[in-house]
Amino acid sequence: MTTLPYNIRPNLVGDYPEIDQSALIDPSAQIIGHVKIAKDVFVGPLAVIRADQRGPDGKVAPIRIEEEVNIQDGVIIHSDAGASVTIGPKTSVTHGAIVHGPCSIGRECFLAPRTVLYKVTLEDHIWVGMGAIAKLVTLPAFTRVPAGSVIRERPEVLGLRLVTDAEREYMKEVWAANSRLRMDYLELRNKAESIRSLTAEKTAKRMG
């Protein structure tokens, strides 16, 4: 049996995280319980993804992080008992954001620093501005939530504008930058592992 790092561990029910080998998980991040992380995901320092709240059936609903998502420093992802979270492909969840399920986030969304989401559905290509709060709503595709706003009701959603071409380009740039970081850190880790392996081999030969 493979021994997992302490920062990647089961919940009280015994659900272990499932993490694709291509994902990059910072050693200071915490991945706990029924978490499914797909290929090419980046999870930055001090992020917490924790699926451990049992529902009425005694089971823990999953937190799913789909392909090429980047979860940045200090992000917290959790959910109510029996509730799941899904974050769609190529979405950026930036510094200090909180996603509390039940939540469903579509593909290529952008959550700016310190945003808070609770019991929401975000369709694709949505921009949530810095420090904004969204609760108990569904946001249509290409919606832009202004920084610092609080969105809790349907009329507030209807008053939001669509993202501009410039904002969509910025969203792509943020995603691309973090995708490069994942590849660079993986390359650095692989080099370090090769050096350790070579050093251990030389030491064994000398002692043998």
Task: Describe each model-derived feature in a short phrase.
Residues 70:
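Glycine/small-residue-rich phosphate/adenosyl-binding loop
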Residues 67:
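A cytosolic small-molecule/anion-sensing beta-strand core signal
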Residues 2-18, 46, 50-52, 56-62, ...:
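Glycine-rich hexapeptide-repeat left-handed beta-helix
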Residues 34-40, 139:
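Short, T/G/N/S-enriched strand-turn elements that build extracellular solenoid repeat scaffolds
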